Amino acid sequence: MKLFAQGTSLDLSHPHVMGILNVTPDSFSDGGTHNSLIDAVKHANLMINAGATIIDVGGESTRPGAAEVSVEEELQRVIPVVEAIAQRFEVWISVDTSKPEVIRESAKVGAHIINDIRSLSEPGALEAAAETGLPVCLMHMQGNPKTMQEAPKYDDAFAEVNRYFIEQIARCEQAGIAKEKLLLDPGFGFGKNLSHNYSLLARLAEFHHFNLPLLVGMSRKSMIGQLLNVGPSERLSGSLACAVIAAMQGAHIIRVHDVKETVEAMRVVEATLSAKENKRYE
């Protein structure tokens, strides 16, 4: 399995670590720490040196209760950072955005993946993504970032997320985005309580029936904090456990804050999976 963008390819026969680069003042874990262009590029460099093969640049906090950001502000935050990384490093760049303007401009300056928590549901986003020809990550979220954690409710979380993916894949294909350009993210922590999150993690491998890359993001999230009763800065061990559980089930991309530790954990996973006669990766 491979992804293609900007004249390059990403081989998904082994798990990739995606380093989180939030250029926001209010992200739940690292808001305000990489706001200047120099700081953002420095942090990207550190993550790449630690083994990240994808950098995920986000200019709008999507934590529960987060305020919305204007198009102009998000463009000012994101585009210079994407351009600077693209010019300096041989790394894939993902842009965490829902806005069509940011999708288009990111593609022009070198982004490889559109990572949209709203699955191209904003007006014009679907058309913008189709125009760029870039791979798109579709994520499941119940509600919206402001309200999603108020009282999430499912009869069957896996079945509902699975049905959502079926609908969104069809919607993308109708808009001219080929299925092989899509990635899937169950959306851990987005409109889900503790039970929903762990039931999805336990059944993650079942999403392979789509034959699409799976991206997961559980790093430092409340599904770990609530379980262990610790704050965001003390969630490394829980984050690594989630990353390993996902990768052992064949997750292709693990989105994290702590790159070095996750890369080391993935080496252990790869050694274990390659020792099996029947590998889970193709």
Task: Please describe what each predicted stretch is.
Residues M1-K2:
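Extended, charged alpha/beta regions that create polyanion-binding interfaces
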Residues A5-Q6, L12, S29-I38, K42-H43, ...:
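Active-site-adjacent loop and "lid" segments of alpha/beta metabolic enzymes
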Residues K42-G58:
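Catalytic domains of carbohydrate-active enzymes, especially glycoside hydrolases
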Residues V91, A178-K181:
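Short acidic capping loops at alpha-helix termini that bridge into adjacent secondary structure
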